[in-house]
């Protein structure tokens, strides 16, 4: 039988209405739950816990919402937690305040206008190091912006902020022994990096110059940022660049360069013992401000050209039987590590610190692909994977025609999100234990 069009529409509408009624009678609504990062185990049991003004917080059975710290929970893993949400209440259990904090972030992500979905979650981080890097030299971000970033990081359970505090773009941290680092080279003529750097101006301006671009963190700023991060269970690793990427240092203190003149190089004169005095003085002040286990010394992209003709550098090489300038860089990295160990800290650096011989206890950040990380792990060194092709957030994330100006590359969200930092085909199970985790890098030449 062929129904008239109007009758057909009525019957179809009635069928849809009946279907809706049938499905509305299902006793439990099973909501879709999306969490970043995905928990180790999650079961969605159906229904919602309603959030209202009658909630009772407690650590016993009387509480509608119960937070329980049990030091024996989950083998004592400080960052793991168990979250159970039913229609009657919520229980969050962990071995430490860190675990409770991460469970709270999961609750924040779960919240909807209908309430909190009923779930059973057992969660542990796969890696102890979950990092984000921020370059504040090429583009300066005041402490308020850094704090906003820390809020976002904590929401997604990232636990390490790597602050790139020094580079040719400007020195960004107060140093009492070297005041000209902030009075003379924390500000520059252009905010736009391309105009300033690629346009070959590259001039710094004294603090207080009208129209100058830049800024720096006072020691009190740093203390506030560190305290703010600590409250969110985030560790901050400071980076001070050695021996390269230090153009600004030699404008303020030209005697530390091979030429002894400003605007000539970005590399420290390693043959000059004053360079090591500077390094140790600066690191001492940094250590006083940052409680981090690790101090990042850079180590990347040193030009090394001036060392080949510098009498002081060549003399040091001859005295120590060095065969090339890579070993000269390694000499500085070794001395930096010895100093940091004497202060109870550990050295971490970009993968160029492998060149010329890796310092005995150094941790390596592998950014030029995974090769440096694989080599380091095989040598028994700890590694943070941060390969540019996956983890550089200054790359284009979609068709460049639709994106803000970027440095190049192509890293869509799916590529970054799906990255596995353990190269299982290249490392044994024992070697893989040296992969501490992963870090995304936000370089700011184009921000």
Regions found by a protein language model. Give the residues of each.
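Acidic, contiguous N-terminal accessory segments
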Residues: 3, 10, 25-130, 341, ...
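Bacterial N-terminal signal peptides
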Residues: 12-21
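Short, basic, glycine/proline-bearing loop/turn elements
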Residues: 54, 134-135, 208-211, 355-362
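Feature activates predominantly on carbohydrate-active enzymes
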Residues: 76-294, 335, 339, 434, ...
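Flexible loop/turn segments at secondary-structure boundaries
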Residues: 140-142, 168-174, 243-249, 296, ...
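Active-site neighborhood of glycoside hydrolase catalytic domains
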Residues: 249-250, 254-362, 367-378
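Flexible, acidic glycine-rich loops studded with aromatic residues
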Residues: 346-352, 360-362, 370-447
